[in-house]
């Protein structure tokens, strides 16, 4: 990634598959103290891989998803256009109630907008992410690595 393509981000933080796997396992180890969970709700798409790793490590078999759009861009498949800061649930979770006993997993909490939207739907769920930026850190219950707000993670 060139400096020009970073845009608003002063730093870049490339994450290999191996590093993501190691860090997601570390997330699972931190979550072990919070067991039992009824299951996992992965925030698509970024939370899918970490959720699978966490589920395997914690021996959780029930995995649901919630699909949330929170970044500006047009998606040709469903023609969603949004401005940054708006959040839209494309596919809700099948979990009933307030989320008590459930674990929500995402790869990154950035501004916290997605996390706040999901938290509003499932206020009693335990929210975990692999990476957290300062603006969204307070929304998650458990995370592994904090990165600065001006860092692009890819």
Model segments located where?
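PRPP-associated nucleotide enzymes
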Residues: 1-154
């Amino acid at each position: 990634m060139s400096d020009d393509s970073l845009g608003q981000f002063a730093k870049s933080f490339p994450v290999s598959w191996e590093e993501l796997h190691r860090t997601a396992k570390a997330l699972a180890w931190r979550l072990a103290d919070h067991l039992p969970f009824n299951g996992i709700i992965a925030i698509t798409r970024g939370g899918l891989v970490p959720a699978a790793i966490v589920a395997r490590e914690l021996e959780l078999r029930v995995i649901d998803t919630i699909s949330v759009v929170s970044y500006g861009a047009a998606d040709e498949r469903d023609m969603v256009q949004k401005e940054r800061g708006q959040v839209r649930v494309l596919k809700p979770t099948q979990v009933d109630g307030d989320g008590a006993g459930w674990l929500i997993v995402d790869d990154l909490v950035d501004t916290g907008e997605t996390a706040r939207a999901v938290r509003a739907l499932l206020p009693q769920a335990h929210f975990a992410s692999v990476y957290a930026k300062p603006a969204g850190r307070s929304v998650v219950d458990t995370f592994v690595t904090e990165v600065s707000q001006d860092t692009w993670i890819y």
